[in-house]
Amino acid sequence: MSALMIARIIVKDPDKLQEYLTKTQAVAAPFGAELVHRGKVDRALTGESADHELAVIVKFPSLAKLDEWYGSDAYQPLKTIRDAGADMRITSYEV
């Protein structure tokens, strides 16, 4: 089964966030990652408001590949850039 990674993002530093997104895409590609969606939140359909500004959805061939990428030596240095650029809530789903 494939897996989705969904990141809900509140931007702190747009330049750092862009650096993170660019580098992460390159690092995730060897693990079979495919960008499904990246964009601004339009509106909340339920509740008072969305608790984030942006959303990113990435598809992986499996949860194992997603976990392999997230734990990879290549990804670890990007976490510092991620945390400087944004507050993120990242979740995974098997589909």
Protein language model features and the residues they cover:
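Short, conserved catalytic or adaptor-binding loops enriched in Gly and charged residues
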Residues: 26-27, 81-83
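Short, compact, well-ordered microdomains
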Residues: 73-80
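Short S/T/G/P-rich N-terminal loop/turn motif that feeds into the first structured element of a domain
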Residues: 1-73, 92-95
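C-terminal end-helix/capping segment
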Residues: 83-95
